[in-house]
Amino acid sequence: MGPLTFRDVKIEFSLEEWQCLDTAQRNLYRDVMLENYRNLVFLGIAVSKPDLITWLEQGKEPWNLKRHEMVDKTPVMCSHFAQDVWPEHSIKDSFQKVILRTYGKYGHENLQLRKDHKSVDACKVYKGGYNGLNQCLTTTDSKIFQCDKYVKVFHKFPNVNRNKIRHTGKKPFKCKNRGKSFCMLSQLTQHKKIHTREYSYKCEECGKAFNWSSTLTKHKIIHTGEKPYKCEECGKAFNRSSNLTKHKIIHTGEKPYKCEECGKAFNRSSTLTKHKRIHTEEKPYKCEECGKAFNQFSILNKHKRIHMEDKPYKCEECGKAFRVFSILKKHKIIHTGEKPYKCEECGKAFNQFSNLTKHKIIHTGEKPYKCDECGKAFNQSSTLTKHKRIHTGEKPYKCEECGKAFKQSSTLTEHKIIHTGEKPYKCEKCGKAFSWSSAFTKHKRNHMEDKPYKCEECGKAFSVFSTLTKHKIIHTREKPYKCEECGKAFNQSSIFTKHKIIHTEGKSYKCEKCGNAFNQSSNLTARKIIYTGEKPYKYEECDKAFNKFSTLITHQIIYTGEKPCKHECGRAFNKSSNYTKEKLQT
């Protein structure tokens, strides 16, 4: 027995067999081939890298390699070049050692038939297609099975029937459970494991079981944290070769997968497949529990967690349990306060790599996501998605309680608190609870002693620099946010954003009591309070309540004696209206 080579551990599929495989099976094949090659290298056996490995590392399909080889090589059939095609079929006479390879590109006339001699140079060339081949064979062995689809010629042996099945497209092996059909029995056997839940391969670290050894091998990397696949371009490391291959496309910018429907191009075939479902509206992934269908497998997986009660991954710090180990890992960072991802530009650190990636765009100033409708550009795809809803008027997030719809999920989350009355944000200093994180953040500043940001104009100090910046506008009366639609200017971006709704949406919030319409839900809420007599804004210092938040703020200034509006002459006022009057007089 000769030394072990890559050919001994290589698995080959016909085109039809390859087409029968789903994405997961193709990825498994790719990983197994790369793993086999790495093992040979580790043992010092493999010297040069086979073309198949180079091809797979680039994320390309093995059948594309065969097409590539056909362009570069002449189809030669001789035992010098193809002794290993059918080793079980021995042909003693050297004149009979004529092998016809799979070269669908070439016609019958272009095929070269070589008589087997001691040296390749001495081979006699025969031309003339199948007739020439038949002449080279004896009468007994000239029973040739021709495959017109891929110009394949076979000696009579058992695998011919198998080849015929591939080209007819028949899938004779059917699963009784689901009715799914397969080209090969081995594929059906693998598929059955899904139904039988046959998990033969168990992880000694966490006890999780798998139905394939290769899946267990991949899983073990989670525990070891090993990342053997490194990108030569940027140094980033990965625990799977397939992930490295996908990552490399970022550097090349290549987008070989184009949608025939709309012309949009993608760097991954899987992304194109997902995209196509937008046009077809296909939802192939169905939940067996409730019947709900989805267009992406990942969304179905997330949905399934609703039905799952089992949460095996528990946080030892707070007791919170999770269904997925990776989510537990991310959660733990909350307790440790660890921020392993640091920005080399400014030194700012983050607890998630995705947050660092988003942050980096601040330094580059890059805005790659452009709106086709108005030309406005954004530095994040999520921001572009939100922006597009201004043009479409889409409000995908609906409240099940009252039916009100919102453009953003975060706004819906805030809205739900109105119905529940929940106050999840509690101050550890004074015990006061808040419904919204923004209100809680503002409140915490009251307890902060350190207020390093001081206003040079009036001496007022602030704990946050952005608050000082906003405060300064009181003195300068600057209005940097200008509406392009009507020319009106504002001193705060939040007020400017609210104003823009007038132009984009009109007055969609109508009062059922008086018929008055408003462009903001907050204005409608304020109107309703007039009829109900409710006074939700209470001043804790004197227990006086108000029906408007602005009235509460005005009252607070009177109570504290603060005079934030300062004139050039030195006089200060507690109301902006009094300040305006003073300006007009001077």
From Swiss-Prot:
Entry keywords, A to Z: DNA-binding, Metal-binding, Nucleus, Repeat, Transcription, Transcription regulation, Zinc, Zinc-finger
Compartments it resides in: Nucleus
C2H2-type zinc finger segments: 145-167, 173-195, 201-223, 229-251, 257-279, 285-307, 313-335, 341-363, 369-391, 397-419, 425-447, 453-475, 481-503, 509-531, 537-559, 563-586
The UniProt record lists the keyword DNA-binding: yes
Family annotation (Pfam families): KRAB (PF01352), zf-C2H2 (PF00096)
Cystine residue pairs: none
Taxonomy, superkingdom: Eukaryota
One Gene Ontology CC term in the entry: nucleus
PROSITE patterns: KRAB, ZINC_FINGER_C2H2_1, ZINC_FINGER_C2H2_2
Family classification: Belongs to the krueppel C2H2-type zinc-finger protein family.
Protein task: May be involved in transcriptional regulation.
Protein name: Zinc finger protein 92
